[in-house]
A protein has these predicted regions:
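Short, Lys/Arg-enriched N-terminal segments with co-localized hydrophobic residues
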Residues: 3-16
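Long amphipathic alpha-helical segments
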Residues: 15-57
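A conserved regulatory-domain signal marking ACT and ACT-like small-molecule sensing domains
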Residues: 18, 34, 38-44, 64-235
Length: 235
């Protein structure tokens, strides 16, 4: 009988382990829920009811809501949340925030002629040190973010290229990053999360070694700036 009890205990531990893994997998898909749990902003019973169908499917059997509630209460915070305080300290060290307005973004299909046309465009505006421009190349397309005053020049230079999309009335928020920023896990996600929570869509992202630039609609730039500045220097 003692042996059977030991087997039952091991089997129960295996089930709990499987349940724990299933919960972690479900929450991994929902990072906002993870953070809400950490800050006690979500009702665990409601979360258990929401996750119950998915977890039951993952485990191949019905999982009771009460078992889910207990497992959620017992779980350890994920690694990314354990690093939250360290990340917040790093963000407080970020440099100045620079805002540029009156921008536009043009996306073209890549072609053999496109690099030469980009070079022509740069040669024309290189003497204007206040001009804002950025070229971002994907596998099949290239996006150019630039000051609106150079739109006519760009259209002239890019004549014959296939324009996929154009965005107008944009602004850019540039953050100065410490040299160690590339080693910080979750840095960009931290900003994406807060900007998204403020209801601001990000039109483009421009990243260099020591700068991160978020391009948003000009109507949203004040809210985006306030959001970033608040998390940089929390009250």
């Amino acid at each position: 009988m003692f042996k059977n009890k030991r087997i039952d205990k091991f089997a129960q531990n295996a089930i709990i382990m499987n349940l724990r893994d299933a919960i972690e997998e479900s929450l991994r898909k929902r990072p906002f829920f993870e953070e809400a749990l950490q800050e006690d902003l979500i009702n665990i019973s409601s979360l258990a009811r929401l996750l119950q169908p998915e977890i039951s499917t993952s485990m191949g059997k019905e999982v009771k809501e009460s078992a889910l509630v207990m497992a959620i209460r017992r779980r350890e915070p994920r690694l990314q949340l354990k690093m939250q305080q360290k990340l917040q300290q790093f963000i407080a060290m970020l440099g100045d925030i620079v805002i540029r307005s009156n921008l536009a973004a043009y996306t073209y299909i890549k072609s053999a002629q496109l690099p030469a046309k980009q070079a022509r465009f740069l040669e024309t505006i290189e003497s204007d040190h206040k001009a804002f421009y950025s070229f971002t190349g994907g596998t099949e397309e290239t996006t150019i973010v630039l000051s609106e005053k150079y739109e006519s020049l760009l259209k002239e230079v890019m004549n014959g290229e296939t324009l996929l999309n154009a965005e107008y009335n944009l602004s850019a928020i540039t953050l100065k990053l410490p040299s160690s920023s590339s080693e910080v896990v979750g840095l960009y996600y931290f900003f994406f999360k807060h900007i998204a929570s403020a209801g601001v869509p990000i039109k483009e992202i421009i990243s260099t070694t020591n700068e991160a630039t978020f391009v948003v609609h000009s109507n949203d730039v004040n809210l985006a700036f306030t959001t970033i500045n608040t998390i940089k220097r929390p009250v």
